[in-house]
Amino acid sequence: MTGVEALDPRLRGDDGNRFWTLSLDDRHRIIEAFKRPRALPALIAMAALAIPGFALAQETAAAAAPVVDKGDVAWMLTSTLLVLLMTVPGLALFYGGLVRSKNVLSVLMQVLAVFSLIVLLWVAYGYTLAFGGGGAFIGTFDKLFLSGVTKETLAATFTAGVSLPEYVFVAFQSTFAGITGALIVGAFAERIRFRAVLLFSALWFTFAYLPIAHMVWYGPDGWLFAKGAIDFAGGTVVHINAGVAGLVGAYLVGRRVGYGREAIKPHNVTFTMIGASLLWVGWFGFNAGSNLEATAGAALAFLNTLLATAAAALAWSLVEAVVKGKPSMLGGASGVVAGLVAITPACGTVGPLGAIAIGAIAGALCVWGVTGLKRLLRADDALDVFGVHGLGGIIGALLTGVFTAPSLGGTGAADFSIAHQFGVQALSVGVTVVWSGVVSVLAFLIVKAVVGLRVAEEAEREGLDITSHGESAYES
């Protein structure tokens, strides 16, 4: 690896955490050399038989051949499964408990259907547009329907010379795309048409998620990546992106019937707590899995995810106790999610104390996000997608630029500048907010013109479980 001393390969210590200690130019050179999936060389043995004296060249080529570690493969498959657990059943139960009993199945169905749809779209064209080469803003169609992706092709990790089977990377990233779309549905729950959810999800995934993912994560060509933006596991790509889309949806779909006049309460906080717990467990795959290797970098992301979430849960509960006189279970569960969201962009580059600080700050501020800020915005964001994911993602993305500093325990390079990195992070946040906002407005307008957005008032009052899906969660 350029600019880094050689390490004992048996220790596998040259991991993703180390990658972020390099200068931006060095990071670009490494990724340029190893970014494209490669077929394993098959002609070396043939050449050795045909060309006398080829042994030395064969040894040199073998030494430079990409390494696939079975432990990494096992870890990444497990991480992929954990992200699936986050969505179904984690997110589904978290959202399902927050809505009224007459709408719980509709939310579960929306989460399941959106995740399933986007995973299929990811294989069809999403993967190639996000990671299949290309310029600053979008990829190419070179890998349409996974063209050229086989058991032999490899995807690079953050460590020079260490790779994963490309199928593993495709599967892992598909779950990220799927859960991002599913997050959005909470903002306009209890009043939107099912077919409108699916059409919007397809449009938004294509024109918002894929360009942002490419700009932030595809190196060295991605525009925000080239600027030096740090988003280890999806603070901008996933959470700000989804939060803004949810807020736009809350405005354009409109308020629920009776909002502000009738009591609209969660029907089962126990479901929500179970969902939050599953999200916390699954998030270790989301964050630590983003290291792409089972090394010390994954361990750091794992520990930071644990600490930030615990700090956020307590911070939310403390603020709630001060403001309302007592902490609530719903608040504790919401604090868990706020902490998970905020540490997502920073989990691989900040130290444990920085993670605690990020979690505590996010937990406290997101209480305001779902109360005071929500009143200021005057939007019926039913399940507080923007207040938790949007605001939490913004807090985490910005604080990544602070706590990555080595002086604060982070893994940044020796010449790391907080002021410079904070500016880059702010740019990344701004681009994501504007891009997702504009695409979301256009997508909702298209959906409204094609299939309509809302169910009829009578159907909404009866509940979407019966009127949209013909079934009820609770039989009387």
Regions found by a protein language model. Name each.
Residues 19-59:
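N-terminal secretory/membrane targeting signals
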Residues 54-476:
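Glycine- and aromatic-enriched membrane alpha-helices
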